[in-house]
């Protein structure tokens, strides 16, 4: 039972057995909470239930919640790898009561789990309580038989939890495990409490008060329970180790690292292995939840975490991407508990590999700059902020990475100077760029949502409807009245679809009761379920409370619906033609076309694209009715419906079934989707693929079209083919054969031309002597080759070297006004003459810089093709000494 997976399952199973609804972990991106970068505690997904904004789905629940603490208020990044219990990613086991049971049952359940299910020695357990909480000590004495010496009263806020300045709050009680007097450290509340002897394993929060402005507290009508047990911490206790990185999960990851990096996790390398293991988990789970590395927001936090791990990989000797090779080991350890890891494995590996390849290109140069700048500092002097900024801006070093590198050298960074340089860049960008400040912020929309409630969407079966205006925003702020110009409007109900799931928002028109007209150019979801209509008031004036008739552009929606439905059929076709590893990684569905990103490790061949087109069009011709079913996410996925990785689903989901049922009676495509679709597959009319290409490592993109746009594209292609056939004076059916014949003729002519150029160059054409000249006793073949470059130039040098026996060969190829130089030195002369040094002299003559290669073969280029002979003279001068 001591393995991490068993410990997790024991916790969840125990509470499930005791009437708790087992819920899967919520995604790491918080829903309906703009104040958090990431979910950082088990209660975060239930915040709206605790505040009363949402009704509980069950009276009690249990979860193992994915959490990330990196960036913002809760940031453990700097400590990870150097302490026993800091992580950027961790799992929080929790049980929750939403007004059901309270302190007595919470304590009884906790004590039963730790002493009976986990088998911890009760004599080695002690608890803390809030000093003003008189109930908790009595309950601990009654339930666990603890005496006063093992119930420690804490008067500080460490044992009082609050959600903020106002809202639900209450005292805490923490359970500690005593490792014994052989380990340094004192009990909680003592001067030595930071030692490793007494380890907190569980925090029970008794949510019993409402905090009001001014500090007043009143009793909640329905007190609740929120508990949090760090899985990694309790696993360390149960496995008898003092460091979280010594539990079985991390041992397996570090063993995989040792194999990948070819080093042992010992001595001063230990911290690097631990950093990589921790950051691998964070990186993988964030990518699985739909976040990719970028330069802003959550994507930037992910980039910082990835690059910190990759720098430690560089310290272990990695000079090419390696971290992605650890993903299979992580999936093996955690994929059963978190199936999204397996579903997203290809995307995770691709994202990590691509980021490391990008970082490797600048890491060496950045480290060189940092080393040089650090070596020039006086003792106690901080690294200048402008240097740290250059490392960030030019070499991709996040500030905390620079700080982490310098920490071991005892050097600090001038953070104020860094911020000054960053602000200067922002001002420059702002002066020359576009600000999006005209749109209302997410916080504003949350206030509207809290006060007015969600928008009721009526557009699944209609393109028209009536709504009452409940909010207006313009210039980035809420207003009561708008008279003209751009604005954002929210109604209590709307037939307008808001962009989500890749499907573009509706366009259309809204006419108010007094005749005012608003043109809708986009609809976006804000605060979870508000439909914000973005557009322009073209006549009249409107104010909140007014009613309006709302009309969606039906023709445009029909085109969007056809494209959206086509992506579902194409997704199924991709999995059939390419394999079941294909999963959707993103999409954008517009009226005129769509794009669809998916996991696949190689370009899709022409034959495969044709097969995919044929599959989809066969389903369109079958004209099967589209099926819609509303169910729970778990039941839908159990029934085989595909879910988009990283997507947040509510308690109920729409399951879309499309296409002809095959063997077993299962429809061709079954997916979770809240979008709007055609009623029959035949409504799509026709489907065609416009393009296929790579987006990033392991991710491909197909763009396509349906209906009138597809027909127009196909007609255009047919017309091009007809025009080409006419110009070549062949029947259309013979065009492929004629083009193939012309292509082969061109190849033959190119080969003949290349051979003629080679013979001309080797024979000393253009006035050069046919044989070698001799300079200081060294044979030299020096030629200008017109129209020759690249590999052909190198081949000429190799051929001439084989004939000259001993000597130096230089060819300057001139093509398109530019020059290329290739120089070869026979092996008997490489100690006296280096091709690399000779090519530098030649390159300077034609306006080039440097060059590269080996002592026996080197190449360079330059922009001045008319100075080819000067390049030859430069080599002659070098041989003369």
Swiss-Prot record:
Its cofactor is Zn(2+). InterPro entries: aa-tRNA-synth_II/BPL/LPL, Ala-tRNA-lgiase_IIc, Ala-tRNA-ligase_IIc_anticod-bd, Ala-tRNA-synth_IIc_core, Ala-tRNA-synth_IIc_N, Ala-tRNA_ligase, Ala_tRNA_ligase_euk/bac, DHHA1_dom. Gene3D superfamilies: 2.40.30.130, 3.10.310.40, 3.30.54.20, 6.10.250.550, Bira Bifunctional Protein, Domain 2 (3.30.930.10), Threonyl-trna Synthetase, Chain A, domain 2 (3.30.980.10). The keyword Aminoacyl-tRNA synthetase applies. It is an enzyme of class 6 (ligase). Its EC number is 6.1.1.7. Signal peptide: none annotated. Belongs to the class-II aminoacyl-tRNA synthetase family. NCBIfam families: alaS. Catalyzes the attachment of alanine to tRNA(Ala) in a two-step reaction: alanine is first activated by ATP to form Ala-AMP and then transferred to the acceptor end of tRNA(Ala). Also edits incorrectly charged Ser-tRNA(Ala) and Gly-tRNA(Ala) via its editing domain. This is Alanine--tRNA ligase.
